[in-house]
Amino acid sequence: MSAQQVTLFTEQPLDLIFGGRLGQIDVAYQTYGTLNEDKSNAVLICHALTGDAEPYLSPVENQAGGWWQSFMGEGLALDTSRYFFICSNVLGGCKGTTGPASINPKTNKPYGSQFPKVTVQDIVRLQKALISHLNIPHLHAVIGGSFGGMQATQWAIYYPDFVDKVVNLCSSLTFSAEAIGFNHVMRQAIINDPNFNNGDYYEGEPPENGLSIARMLGMLTYRTDLQLAKAFGRATKNEGHYWGDYFQVESYLSYQGQKFLGRFDANSYLHLLRALDIYDPSIGFDNIKEALSRIKAHYTLVAVTNDQLFKLTDLHKSKTLLEQAGVPLDYYEFPSDYGHDAFLVDYDTFEPKIRSGLE
């Protein structure tokens, strides 16, 4: 079953944080489970940077499954026999929701370089419009990992009486200088690709080389040195090119870079990376404590101690800020060979924390 589609903001455009406006916004979304009679079991799932609206896919239709396939189903951490789950593709994405590759109704051409700047705050306001469209009066919980964790946090700030619980997996309240630096290098790889053309490449060749390189760097931040050592060590390829895929780890990264080209748009990657960099709960408030003090939801924060992207020190800072703001908080930390991506694949470790956070 493919994602469902709805067009929102058809009468009045959505005013964005940085001053842009978007109307006629297409939103791709999917639902799982059954909404109960009093509509009290709805849970919004917020996807990570390159995710989509379908965390679960029917094995009959797609053998690879969705990005949270092993976590979702009857009796699992994301229990479809108890909760009604909603997940939508984010604003600025390229998986069915309006983004830079979408057709601008004013020009009948892809937005490209004309697509406005988007923030996590804008993404959340579009999600709220979707929830209203679905006639859901209240959310039992909002859950997300990484970029999705930032969205979950913003939900609790913007709509404190609408959300009962927040589950934030592997995400701090703001991005670190080091992480912004990684994103800068990824952006430069794309922007300096000869095919980028200031983002207006849809009638020609896309900046595939730059996007592939960006993805390779990103993959290194999602993994751990121990994981790479176990998988590849210093093993070489039998016929590896001296300046290219000489080591097996290089071949793996090249494969991941090429694989990414078939499923993501370079402009969307640029916009969402910058939204990740810029996110700050204090936007629109005098300071971060004022923003966090609005949260009434019970907040579950989960950290992976050897996460290479959202470092433990930043999660500790986030924990302290939440506590100082009086947010009711459960905090967990533990190591995982999977590093930042643990929230997507390390079911045994994350299952009890997710289940507890949703209770």
Swiss-Prot record:
Its main location: cytoplasm. Keywords: Acyltransferase, Amino-acid biosynthesis, Cytoplasm, Methionine biosynthesis, Transferase. It comes from the Bacteria. Residues 41-346 form the AB hydrolase-1 domain. Substrate binds at R215, D341. InterPro entries: AB_hydrolase_1, AB_hydrolase_fold, HAT_MetX-like. Pfam families: Abhydrolase_1 (PF00561). One of its GO terms (cellular component) is cytoplasm. Homodimer. This is Homoserine O-acetyltransferase.
